[in-house]
Amino acid sequence: MKEININVEHLTRVEGHGNIVMNAKNGKVEKVMWEVSEAPRLFEAFVRGKPYHQLARITSRICGICSIGHTLASLKATEAAMDIEISEQSQLLRRLAIHGENMQSHILHLGYLISPDLFGTGSVVPLVRTHTDAVLAVVKLHRLANEFSEVVCGRTTHPTNLIPGGFYKTPSPLKLQEYRQKLLDSVETANLVAGIILDNAGALPDFTRETEFIALTAKDEYALYDGLIGSTDAGTYPVDEYVSVVNEFVVPQSTAKYCKNKREAFMVGALARLNLNYDHLSPLAKQWAEKFGLKPVCHNPFMNNVAQLVEFVHSIEDSVSLIDRLLEDYKDEPRPEITPKAGRGVGAVDVPRGILFHEYVYDSDGNCARANCVIPTNQNHNNIQHDFEAFAPTLLDKPEKEIELNMEMLVRAYDPCISCSTHFLNVEWKR
């Protein structure tokens, strides 16, 4: 039997740096490993001693793609710690904000990073010539998502309108009405992109490994902004109990922590959300899920990309509904007045890559005494490793380059944000 040695350093078409190592001999996998080599980011240390109104601004910089999600998780943690209530209008606007980010991130990942795998090219660049209409459709949807996020959040990345207690400046009702129509008009383009992905979905490997899925879940909505922690294995947990759910631990090959709950690992992200919130998908989103044969509980991690597509359509439709609700009684609300106080708070939102937790402890002056952030990709690393261990033995009869591509595709299916996940370093000095 042939000997296989794969060493992919700095996997491409993902955010950050990760390596794939695989060695096989005599028809047996001797070693397979997902290595995270990114340098730690230390954001929990950055925010210590900082006043409450600065934390969302700082922590949004954890990620340029998920800056809105980090801002919202940060604000929710601060508001929980200080017993700050926000208006129904602000809650609806924040739901719009997270839809904007979902659309931004999902179309970026599907259109630029995953499509080359579906069409057998090394990057999206050759597709500009061979599939011009498809690439232009992706660019059109990406531009709309960016513009929509700017209208709601003040700018496309690192939002300025989202502040503790509400909004710095509420979006213009005329702008909301304008983008309501643009969202409706985008459905045709979204259907075009979905149809192209459906036609090429045969390129996604048919691989399943049973695992636990964790996401926000709610009784009356497809949970992104609010809800309980849901598990396909263990029901629901209060957000405050997130530490006992994620159970972080360290491994030698990773600068990011691993997580586990009821099994050896769990998965977060679009597929986890769909598995737990399927019944609350919008009508067109559910139609596309059915066309792809995607229904709960799906254990194929490659279908995470299909779930992202379904969520993109859901975000369009639900955003239109949210705008309709907002415009029924829209107000130019004043900026909230906040009196700092001591307290602990946890904020959770489900961002494009999965459930995100921020926890802060404040002193009586409103300065941060302690912070903890648990990032979605950090929760997925362990599941990627266990998928590797199950997937690699099924590939041994393939050429080495094809094995390498399949392993790379598996990581890309998770849409990892690797540099976000290497967020914590604890150094204990002994003299």
Indicate where each model-derived feature is located:
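Active-site catalytic microenvironments in core metabolic enzymes, especially phosphate/sugar-handling
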Residues: G366
